[in-house]
């Protein structure tokens, strides 16, 4: 029932709605038209009212203006009457604009007009804008303009950072370069000093005092990893020197600007000789060389009658005159007069610039296999020893019985074989004393070998040597390419037994031939 009633009610309501809707649209249309007309009429009335108000305002303004004009005219007439007597007293040639200026003193017609008391003559060709500037001294048209007193001539190719450096003395191209004042009696001077200073002996515990000298450039490496491996190389050298009672100096200063690159070692060696007379041997070692036989010791008694010990091959030196017959990356030089004389004869071939370039041409022509490039310290030493053989060669020991210099490429891949077959203390090809990474240039931006191979090989060499140091403490690297370590023996209640057995300082193994 509820549903049927709903439908019926809905039908009736729908019919009535339709009827109302038709009548409603007519009514609404009429009302909307009336509203539009009413709104339009109101807008017209508002516009008329605005125009009327505007006219009233304009009329009021005109009247006020007329009143103002009348008042202004009366005031002007009064002012003119008062001014006429005054104007009659003013000369006829005076300008009206001068009335506002204060009275001036009489000016002589022959006097020169000035704004202030006379300071300096102003040239006739000076621009008006220049009058506010201080007077300038006369400038000769042929003079050279400068910002201040002349300090020094600056070459056109100078870098901006070089301007902060003090001026350098000119070096004559014909002058012979020297490392310093010529010393002729160093042996006697040193002997006297040693006698006067017994607390600094040149022989300690029966061994000649050695100072290991190494170093690198003053600035950082081109690549951060280069600094990392330089640090490892320094650590390796410190370990060896600590275990063998050798002093070490790491130099990063360029002591002589003329001797750069390979040549920086010469002034350093000479300086240390003269500053440490207690040192018997200066041992130079390149930064890219590593000790890989920590147990091996330099057989100094073998060199009792020699002053220079350097790795090389006599046949390559004397018969073939090869430029790689010797290697100046690692050598020992006795602190004596002979060595100072050798340095004095060696250094003049190294000053950078024209001397080094011209000497390089001579060395390339003289030595077998040498490429054409500027003079290097190694070629220069070989040339010196061959060209002045009678003077030098008697005191030179060309060492090849052990690896004072061991070329890395034929060694680093054999370390596992060496560990399996041999033992440290041999120093030769069975267990190389030094592994030298010639051509890798870990600190430079370029190298003669693949960078990745060089750094991996240096890592192997370092860990190979470091295992010999860690053995005393009961540790070893997990692998030759791993920086991580592992324990190789347990701790005991009798640790001194391990010290006596593994301490390199107490081990005296003879080097086998």
From Swiss-Prot:
Q: State what this protein does.
A: Xylosyltransferase specific to UDP-D-xylose that accepts cellohexaose as substrate to produce xyloglucan.
Q: Which GO terms describe its cellular component?
A: endosome; Golgi apparatus; Golgi membrane; trans-Golgi network
Annotated GO molecular function terms are: UDP-xylosyltransferase activity; xyloglucan 6-xylosyltransferase activity
Concerning its family, UniProt says: Belongs to the glycosyltransferase 34 family.
> Can you say what this protein is called?
Xyloglucan 6-xylosyltransferase 4
Ranges facing Cytoplasmic side: 1-39
Reactions catalysed according to its record: Transfers an alpha-D-xylosyl residue from UDP-D-xylose to a glucose residue in xyloglucan, forming an alpha-(1->6)-D-xylosyl-D-glucose linkage
Q: Where in the cell is it found?
A: Golgi apparatus membrane
Q: Which UniProt keywords apply?
A: Glycoprotein, Glycosyltransferase, Golgi apparatus, Membrane, Signal-anchor, Transferase, Transmembrane, Transmembrane helix
Instruction: Please give the organism.
Output: Arabidopsis thaliana (Mouse-ear cress)
Question: Topology relative to the membrane, per the entry?
Answer: Single-pass type II membrane protein
Signal sequence interval, chain numbering: none
Transmembrane stretches, by residue range? 40-60
Which top-level group of life is the source organism from? Eukaryota
Entry-linked InterPro entries? Glyco_trans_34 (IPR008630), Nucleotide-diphossugar_trans (IPR029044)
Give the glycosylated residues.
Answer: 76, 110, 142, 174, 490
Indicate where this protein is primarily found. Golgi
Topology feature Lumenal, residues: 61-513
């Amino acid at each position: 029932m509820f549903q049927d009633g709903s439908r019926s009610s809905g039908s009736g309501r729908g019919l009535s709605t339709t009827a109302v809707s038709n009548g409603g649209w007519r009514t609404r249309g009429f009302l909307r038209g009336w509203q539009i007309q009413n709104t339009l009429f109101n807008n017209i009335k508002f516009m008329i009212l605005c125009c009327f108000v505007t006219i009233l305002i304009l009329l009021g303004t005109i009247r006020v203006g007329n009143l103002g004009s009348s008042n202004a005219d009366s005031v002007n007439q009064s002012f003119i009457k008062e001014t006429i007597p005054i104007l009659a007293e003013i000369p006829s040639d005076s300008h009206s604009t001068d009335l506002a200026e204060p009275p001036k003193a009489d000016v002589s017609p022959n006097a020169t007009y000035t704004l202030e008391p006379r300071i300096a003559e102003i040239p006739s060709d000076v621009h008006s804008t220049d009058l506010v500037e201080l007077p300038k001294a006369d400038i000769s048209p042929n003079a050279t303009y400068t910002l201040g007193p002349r300090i020094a001539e600056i070459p056109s190719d100078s870098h901006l950072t070089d301007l902060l450096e003090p001026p350098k003395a000119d070096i004559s191209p014909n002058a012979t370069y020297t490392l310093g004042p010529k010393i002729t009696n160093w042996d006697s001077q040193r002997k006297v000093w040693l006698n006067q200073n017994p607390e600094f002996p040149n022989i300690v515990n029966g061994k000649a005092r050695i100072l290991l000298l190494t170093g690198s450039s003053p600035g950082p490496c081109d690549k951060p990893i280069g600094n990392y491996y330089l640090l490892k190389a320094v650590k390796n050298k410190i370990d060896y020197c600590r275990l063998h009672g050798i002093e070490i100096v790491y130099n990063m200063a360029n002591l002589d600007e003329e001797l750069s690159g390979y040549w920086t070692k010469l002034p350093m060696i000479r300086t240390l000789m003269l500053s440490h007379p207690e040192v018997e041997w200066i041992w130079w070692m390149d930064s890219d060389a590593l000790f890989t036989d920590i147990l091996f010791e330099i057989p100094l008694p073998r060199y009792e009658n020699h002053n220079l010990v350097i790795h090389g091959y006599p046949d390559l030196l004397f018969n073939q005159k090869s430029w790689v017959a010797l290697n100046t990356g690692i050598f020992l030089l006795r602190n004596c007069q002979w060595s100072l004389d050798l340095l004095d004869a060696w250094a003049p071939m190294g000053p950078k610039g024209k001397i080094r370039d011209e000497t390089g041409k001579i060395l390339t022509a003289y030595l077998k296999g040498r490429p054409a490039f500027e003079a290097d310290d190694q070629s220069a030493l070989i040339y010196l020893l061959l060209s002045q053989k009678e003077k030098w060669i008697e005191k030179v020991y060309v060492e090849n019985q052990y690896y004072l210099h061991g070329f890395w490429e034929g060694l680093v891949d054999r370390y596992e074989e060496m560990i399996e077959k041999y033992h440290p203390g041999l120093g030769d090809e069975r267990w190389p004393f030094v592994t030298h990474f010639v051509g890798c240039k870990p600190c430079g931006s370029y190298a003669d070998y693949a960078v990745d191979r060089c750094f991996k090989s240096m890592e192997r060499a370092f860990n190979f040597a470091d295992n010999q140091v860690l053995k005393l403490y009961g540790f070893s690297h997990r692998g030759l390419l791993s920086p991580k370590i592992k324990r190789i023996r347990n701790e005991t209640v009798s640790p001194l037994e391990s010290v006596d057995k593994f301490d390199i300082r107490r081990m005296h193994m003879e080097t086998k031939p």
